[in-house]
């Protein structure tokens, strides 16, 4: 799988721009748990996931994590290069949720091409708008949706991503995704278990009734 076949703007670049990217492109393999980008002090560049899974999250003043969005195969991330856009002051951390192969276009290289190419600039603005729309949707969920519905939604999302009803995940990890406390998540999961929705075991959650979880998240 070549970068040229995966980068959606490749055919919109001229020969010189393609050469600049090819000469500066970074190929990186990161293991699960690796922090790839850490706040505004980093200016990693534009990320394109070749294979794997990344998680973009923020930290509250109390040190709690909350997941903004995840990145899968062929997804691009611009917030890792937000330093090239002065109007954006958004401190995010990007972590590998699975072993991941990715490409990185250094921020200064991408910024230079964005100034030269209208298609690149337009695509960048559209992608950034999409990401901020995702974040705004998440904020609405946090403000207006009860925790039981958010936990149900998260469990269903995980079963879809992992393609299994047996999730190898800790209560702490769920809390980090949802911006909650581990103890609160544990109480909610125990309630789900008492209702026959899930089965809990050490480091694992088995979904027993996905239809009722779907109904719960829609209420």
What function would you assign to each model-found segment?
Residues 61-68:
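Short alpha-helix-to-loop micro-motif enriched in aromatics/charged/Gly
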Residues 97, 115-180:
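Polybasic "coupling" helices that flank or enter modular domains
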Residues 36-41:
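Short phosphate-coordinating micro-motif centered on Lys-Gly-acidic
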């Amino acid at each position: 799988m070549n970068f040229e076949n995966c980068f959606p703007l490749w055919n919109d670049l001229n020969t010189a721009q393609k050469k600049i990217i090819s000469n500066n492109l970074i190929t990186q393999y990161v293991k699960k748990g690796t922090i790839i980008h850490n706040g505004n002090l980093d200016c990693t560049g534009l990320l394109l996931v070749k294979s794997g899974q990344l998680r973009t999250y923020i930290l509250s003043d109390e040190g709690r994590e909350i997941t903004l969005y995840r990145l899968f195969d062929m997804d691009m991330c611009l917030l890792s290069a937000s330093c090239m856009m002065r109007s954006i002051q958004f401190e995010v951390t990007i972590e590998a949720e699975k072993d991941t192969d990715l490409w990185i276009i250094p921020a200064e290289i991408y910024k230079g091409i964005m100034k030269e190419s209208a298609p690149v600039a337009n695509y960048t603005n559209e992608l950034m708008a999409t990401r901020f729309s995702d974040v705004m949707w998440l904020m609405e969920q946090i403000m207006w949706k009860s925790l039981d519905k958010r936990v149900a939604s998260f469990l269903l999302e995980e079963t879809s991503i992992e393609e299994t009803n047996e999730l190898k995940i800790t209560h702490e990890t769920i809390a980090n995704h949802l911006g909650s406390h581990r103890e609160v998540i544990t109480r909610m999961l125990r309630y789900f278990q008492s209702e026959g929705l899930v089965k809990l075991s050490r480091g694992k959650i088995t979904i027993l009734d996905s239809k009722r979880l779907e109904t719960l998240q829609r209420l």
